[in-house]
Amino acid sequence: AAEYVPEKVKKAEKKLEDNPYDLDAWSILIREAQNQPIDKARKTYERLVAQFPSSGRFWKLYVEAEVNIFIFFSY
């Protein structure tokens, strides 16, 4: 079955096709990723840090998502 994608995410993806540096569009995708399991969110984080490789803020979001899942399963 096809996976449901919220309309706001579709619009954000379209904006990024036109301008891959659109921070408003990235913010929508980041918020969506933060509400997903890491195995689904990882692709978004990978794209984010590939687009902004020198952004410590974005790397921190990615690392925190990975560490949070590690901590969750450690208990």
Each language-model region and where it sits:
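Alpha-helical solenoid scaffolds in eukaryotic macromolecular assemblies
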Residues: 1-75
